[in-house]
Amino acid sequence: MKKRKWLSLLLAVMMLVSAVPFFPVTADAAADGTVEVSTWAELKEALNYTTKCSVVKVVKDIETKSLNGHTGLHQDNIIFMTMAMDKVLDLNGHTVNAYAKYYSEVAQGYLINISHKDARLTIRDSVGGGALIGEFNQEFYYEFINVSKGTLVMESGTVKM
């Protein structure tokens, strides 16, 4: 009987120990739903196909000229919002300079596409001086943000082409 009690106690202790994480738990978003980004890839990941965060906060100027062999943004760099989500892009006083050297590389002519009826992107600049800048090397029709469905709200900040 004593052996059985000890085994039960040992089993309970083992179950307790195995339930406690030994490594720190990491999360994509902070407790308030904010994700901080400092590159175009991080910005794309935070806005593309995810509902894990509600605020995407730019924490450093983002420059895209050096991407893809210094030709800037290409087709695979386009941000697609194709599912129901409500995101705030906080420029936080920083500049996002989206550069595309060749129109053929960004065939759609846009860099952010909102294409779901329940997708909403709000752009704000909580600090002041923040901007989305589209820099295109060729004389073609470009849109920084295309809204085929869904909603785009511009609370503050600047968009320059």
Please identify what each model-predicted range represents:
Residues 1-10:
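Bacterial N-terminal signal peptides that target proteins for export
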Residues 61-62, 94-95, 127-129:
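Acidic glycine-/aspartate-rich tracts in secreted/extracellular proteins
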Residues 64-88, 97-125, 135-152:
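Extracellular beta-strand-rich solenoid/capping regions of secreted or surface-exposed proteins
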Residues 19-33:
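Sec-dependent signal peptide cleavage junction
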Residues 11-19:
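Hydrophobic core
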Residues 30-59, 64-69:
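Acidic Gly/Asp/Thr-rich repetitive segments characteristic of extracellular carbohydrate-active
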